């Protein structure tokens, strides 16, 4: 298997190297090509360690909210202490951070850097290759895959938009069903600052989060789980005018919808513990042939 993978890597590198030369003669070497080459060169490190049913090789696809959650919430450190190898994928230009906390210098090339529901659905619709030739194949080098959209997604302006979100996540779930050797953890999108939303849009954001947590979405799909980031960050007092919006004690100054350090310090350990519990439970389920 290793020999076959080596020759596949060499072949893929040759093709991408030729493409790079063409780009150099024309528009210049694009960062996407550089990242793809680096991902191919490093893929063995990701695919060989923490695999074979251990479900301890974890990657988290996110943007800035996830970055602060990881850094300020001690997510990587907590998972490392429990024996997990935690990678995370930020914007493409930042790329992937490895389990030691070091930037790798490459990304998996998320199409258009789009982690909104439509972008995630497009990512999951990519063909799966043994090598990380696209973003989906890159994420699938890891056994536990977390992903989230950022807070603008919580500005759900109509019931029709809410239903479209659900359809995209159902399409993703169909793909997840095809890969029981992987565990997928969905994070509900974080809530918005009250200045950036309306009560109606916020209520739909809560409804979307609740749906992702529901039996309707999860029952019968044992390798799919949901962490309620929205619920962890949103005001839940039904009598508050800011219900379903970013909690006052979790806000930064002004109108910024990024949760503050207090929020990240409180929620980060909860996320790490959820990953550990969920991975352990699924590992046992797979081992028992359930």
Features from the language model and the residues they span:
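N-terminal Sec-pathway targeting helices
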Residues: 1-16
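Membrane-interface motif at the C-terminal end of an N-terminal transmembrane signal
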Residues: 17-37
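Serine-esterase "nucleophile elbow" of acetyl-processing enzymes
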Residues: 31-95
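Structural recognition of the beta-strand scaffold that forms the well-ordered cores
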Residues: 57-61, 85-90, 95, 143-149, ...
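Conserved SGNH/GDSL esterase-like catalytic core that processes O-acyl groups on lipids
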Residues: 67-68, 75-159
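Well-ordered, non-membrane alpha-helical segments in soluble/globular domains
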Residues: 122-131, 160-172, 201-214
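Active-site segments of SGNH/GDSL-like serine hydrolases
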Residues: 151-152, 175-208
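Catalytic His-Asp segment of secreted/periplasmic serine-dependent ester chemistry enzymes
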Residues: 192-290
């Amino acid at each position: 298997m290793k020999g076959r993978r080596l020759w596949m890597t060499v072949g893929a590198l040759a093709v991408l190297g030729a493409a790079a030369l063409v780009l150099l003669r024309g528009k210049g070497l694009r960062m996407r090509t550089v990242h793809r080459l680096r991902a191919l060169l490093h893929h063995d490190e990701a695919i060989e360690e923490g695999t074979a049913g251990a479900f301890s090789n974890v990657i988290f696809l996110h943007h800035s909210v996830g970055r602060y959650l990881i850094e300020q919430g001690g997510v990587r450190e907590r998972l490392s202490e429990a024996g997990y190898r935690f990678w995370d994928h930020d914007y493409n230009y930042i790329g992937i951070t490895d389990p030691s906390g070091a930037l790798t210098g490459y990304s998996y090339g998320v199409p258009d850097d789009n982690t909104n529901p439509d972008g995630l659905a497009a990512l999951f619709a990519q063909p799966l290759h043994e090598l990380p030739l696209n973003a989906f194949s890159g994420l699938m080098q890891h056994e536990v895959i977390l992903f989230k959209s950022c807070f603008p997604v919580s500005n759900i302006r109509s019931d029709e938009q809410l239903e479209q979100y659900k359809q995209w996540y159902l399409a993703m779930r169909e793909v997840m069903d095809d890969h029981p050797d992987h565990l997928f953890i969905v994070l509900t999108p974080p809530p918005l600052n009250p200045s950036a939303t309306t009560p109606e849009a916020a209520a739909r954001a809560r409804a979307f989060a609740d749906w992702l947590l529901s039996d309707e979405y999860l029952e019968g799909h044992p390798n799919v789980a949901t962490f309620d980031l929205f619920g962890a960050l949103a005001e839940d007092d039904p009598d508050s005018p800011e219900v379903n919006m970013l909690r006052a004690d979790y806000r930064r100054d002004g109108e910024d919808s990024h949760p503050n350090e207090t929020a990240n310090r409180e929620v980060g350990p909860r996320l790490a513990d959820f990953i550990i519990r969920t991975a352990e439970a699924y590992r046992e389920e797979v081992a028992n042939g359930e």
